[in-house]
Design a protein with these regions (language model features):
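N-terminal targeting leaders
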Residues: 2-7, 12-195
């Protein structure tokens, strides 16, 4: 036991010295995003505020997922009934700084579809990989009862259409809601992308 502690200490020092644990996926996603870095930072801040507004209302952080792109807010998840849906939307609309708000909030089904939804999500990601114009790392995917919700910022109208076509062809997909956005003036990235 005594010889293990110095070894662990050395390992810790080496790990920290090599940069430590970094969120490499998030770093790569930010560097190749269609949004500029300032818009990404503002979106992160608005997303936190949106999540806090939902939590203050008593919503489970696992039931409703907030997203923000170019100042536009989205809330996605199952709700128990119309009253909960109205409450979620009311809380989200109270967030200052959001330019708009859209939602996909279907009623929770009586039977769980979680296992099928996880498998469908994996298949949807796999279907998007062969389309470099989409940039699968820039598309957030939610699957609710077999219905796929696509969110994010893509580089062209062709990429938006390709994403919907590819996803609709996946086995198990019952429908597609396309919340993919194109870069708007003032929000677009200022550097060329290598993909």
């Amino acid at each position: 036991m005594k010889s293990v502690l110095p070894l662990l200490a050395v390992l810790l020092i080496v790990t920290v010295g090599c940069g430590g644990a970094r969120p490499y996926r998030a770093m790569a996603r930010a560097a190749t995003s269609e949004e500029n870095v300032f818009a990404q930072a503002q979106d992160k801040e608005l997303k936190v505020q949106l999540r806090e507004a939902l939590l203050a209302r008593g919503e489970s952080p696992l039931a409703i997922t907030p997203y923000v792109y170019m100042g536009r807010g989205f809330v996605v998840g199952f709700v128990g009934d119309g009253a909960q849906r109205d409450g979620v939307l009311s809380a989200a609309q109270g967030v200052q700084g959001l330019r708009s708000l859209q939602s996909y909030l279907p009623d929770r089904p009586t039977t769980s579809s979680t296992a099928n939804d996880v498998a469908t999500k994996a298949n949807v990601k796999a279907a998007l990989v062969p389309h470099p114009e989409i940039g699968v790392t820039h598309v957030d995917i939610e699957v609710l009862g077999g219905h796929v919700v696509l969110l994010g910022v893509v580089g062209s109208e062709e990429a938006r259409e390709s994403a919907v076509t590819a996803v609709a062809a996946v086995s198990g997909v019952k429908g597609v809601t396309n919340f993919l956005l194109l870069p708007e003036p003032g929000y677009e990235s200022q550097r060329p992308h290598l993909r």
